[in-house]
């Protein structure tokens, strides 16, 4: 049978070209489906791009609409973050903005910007300690990423991090490409570019922050072990290590057994006896699944660790790698001394074995870590897990690794911690403090996801629009609040039997749903209320009503003392204070608000005296004149010139848009007002018993 060859091709420049194309679309405003408002500045972006790079937007966009307003980030800072998201670079940022940039990156859940201060502090330590011992202050992190195939010093690819301990005056060289050699591997954590490439490889939407505090006593030992990674050529285990490629850096996933029993059975015979305390060490998998890391602490005890592998590739000899840095280290730790961080793929770890179906599982160490909150599948939270093995004496002696994990150890720790609940179709994370909820009861710690001190968010998922109130999945938890979502503009929060409609943008609560709908037009900019007399459109009906008063000249505010009417409250209040010497804001009711009559104003012509025959017009205010001698209706052209019309002669054609009325026709208001959008208004004042017209010049709204 003829064999066929399978060809695989990879475009290495595709990711960069795609990112540049998306950035060009954002700059041109093409296909942007979300608007982020920061300090009166609007940023157009793509929803999927922001959610892929920021955990905050990933959670927010599940409930937010097309317009999002952020009040905890500065506009110039957010512009830099947005440029990084679309270009993967931070270019020419001022030093005084760096601290605010890192803070905003933590709030928005952008891992690279959030961790930017760590490599910068380590670079300072390396440069400052150049005269001492060549980079002692920079803690090595050999377990953060498995080394790529070892390259010689004349490798054609430029090295991202190149810090040699024996050269005291050499500064780190950071370039755009990524490669590591055995000499550079020991100090690669000191560069921010490695974090940048790591972010490109395992950038995930849902992340959790985990950190391990390494004591200062362990840093020199780890640095010394990292320096011993160079292996003589006659070592037969070197080819096994060189098989670690970016596509499969650790053979653990392919060779480990799928069940816990088989893993424990195979590893019990090959696991050596180690001196506690020890930590498990697993190299980072570049796939965007769950990843984790811990630094080994048993190396300083003088006992070599062997790579545990359960299949044909035998890297299990305890004496085969006396000085080589192991790729994967396991230790026989008692199960009750491990608090496991388990990914969503239900990977289970034991003290003597490991069975990962698709991703790695990390035992955290000798002392169990009880997280403050227990998260479940579908709920993400920013959380920093601190280990009590030692306190760092220097700012660079701790490591942060981004991993998509679900923290948890047992049901007992879940009962002790603050309850977290999964509701049918909803993901709920309660706030830590009730003080952030204003206007509601203390038991209602649900909403408010836009704020500097807010790290949790309520995520209701719209699955069934006709479904009623949600039900709790877990038993034994107090039903303090219920929540449902039928629309994308508000939450429906039920507290103590009362329903609150909460705006998803500004978190204002309303008792009436129609009031919230009118309010949300301010955020969505859906101007649904056009003016009846001009082209302006308003988001709220009350805004339109205040504006239309200037067109109609209607006086709705009436003084009860003298009966005078006024156009607005301010004029009426001034009248009451000056004329009647009374306080309109007192207990007694001194005015009345009449209902709006919505007078339809038309463009009017002139009524003048037939004996006079001419009305002088300056082109500014058109004055209708009614006299006893007779009634004549002239017309006006665009230049403000009035043409007299003799009532005994046929009517002459007027300028375009204007029509003259016959003098024999009885005069009424419909003859005076002619349809045209004119801004000059008047109001007939009948309070003084005469036919005097008072003119109101429209005010700009």
Curated annotation (Swiss-Prot):
Name the segments for region: Disordered: 128-158, 181-311, 644-664
Report the residue ranges that make up the BTB domain in this protein: 32-94
Please state where this protein is localized: Nucleus
ZnF segments: C2H2-type: 501-523, 529-551, 557-580
Q: Per its UniProt record, what SUPFAM superfamilies does this chain match? A: beta-beta-alpha zinc fingers, POZ domain
| Keyword Acetylation found | no
Spans of biased composition, class Low complexity? 259-273
Q: Where is this region: Required for methylation dependent DNA-binding?
A: 470-609
Listed SMART domains: BTB, ZnF_C2H2
The UniProt entry, under InterPro entries, shows:
BTB/POZ_dom, SKP1/BTB/POZ_sf, Znf_C2H2_sf, Znf_C2H2_type, ZnFinger_BTB_dom_contain
Q: Does the keyword Zinc-finger apply?
A: yes
Q: What are the protein's UniProt keywords?
A: Developmental protein, DNA-binding, Metal-binding, Nucleus, Repeat, Repressor, Transcription, Transcription regulation, Wnt signaling pathway, Zinc, Zinc-finger
Q: How does it assemble?
A: Self associates. Interacts with tcf7l1-A, leading to repression of tcf7l1-A target genes. Interacts with ctnnd1, and this interaction may inhibit DNA-binding. Interacts with ncor1.
Q: What is this protein called?
A: Transcriptional regulator Kaiso
Natural source organism: Xenopus laevis (African clawed frog)
